[in-house]
């Protein structure tokens, strides 16, 4: 049985190293993509401060993301590739760090309380499987250290999991 440990880190790099270690232990021996996404979302939501949403969107067709496991308020179920922060991350095949979602062109307001967002694609080889999406009610909540940390989390998730 997995037991989450409180992370007491002096800086974000240390926080994400410890978070990655916990996630590796949590996902060890389990290949189911949905179960692993659910546990990853729960770990992120309960560990990282100042989030109002943490979860996954799954690329179910070449042009559409579908809501996957998450923690937080109910969310948009379908997002077209190219729309909003999640759709832009898939279309551009890169992480998107948005300090002010209200200034982002074509932002999709699934939760009016969200002010900043970090979206990281889940990539296996050349294929995008989906994205990890983090939202915060604070403007500029995320920085490059968060981006690097969540990109590492995404890699751990992809290596540990079968496709959706």
Identify the role of each PLM range.
Residues 1-70, 152, 156-164:
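Intrinsically disordered, low-complexity terminal regulatory regions
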Residues 48, 110-114:
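Short loop/turn motifs at secondary-structure junctions and domain boundaries
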Residues 53, 119, 131:
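Short hydrophobic/aromatic beta-strand element in the GNAT-like acyltransferase core
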Residues 59-110:
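Regulatory sensory and allosteric helical modules in signal-transduction proteins
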Residues 73, 136-137:
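A short acidic/small-residue loop/turn micro-motif
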Residues 116-123:
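A short, aliphatic-rich beta-strand micro-motif
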Residues 123-136:
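Sensory-domain boundary capping and coupling elements
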Residues 139-146:
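A short acidic/glycine-rich loop-to-helix N-cap element
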């Amino acid at each position: 049985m997995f037991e989450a440990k409180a992370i007491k880190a002096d800086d974000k790099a240390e926080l994400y190293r410890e978070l990655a270690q916990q996630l590796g232990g949590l996902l060890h021996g389990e290949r189911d993509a949905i179960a692993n996404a659910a546990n990853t979302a729960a770990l992120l939501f309960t560990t990282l401060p100042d989030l109002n949403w943490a979860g996954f969107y799954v690329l179910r067709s070449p042009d559409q993301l579908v809501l996957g496991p998450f923690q937080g308020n109910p969310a948009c179920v379908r997002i077209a590739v190219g729309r909003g922060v999640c759709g832009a991350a898939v279309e551009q095949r890169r992480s998107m760090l948005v300090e002010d979602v209200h200034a982002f062109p074509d932002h999709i307001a699934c939760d009016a309380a969200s002010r900043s967002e970090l979206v990281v694609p889940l990539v296996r080889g050349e294929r995008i499987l989906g994205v990890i999406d983090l939202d915060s009610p604070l403007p500029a909540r995320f920085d490059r250290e968060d981006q690097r940390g969540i990109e590492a989390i995404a890699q751990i998730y992809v290596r540990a999991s079968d496709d959706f």
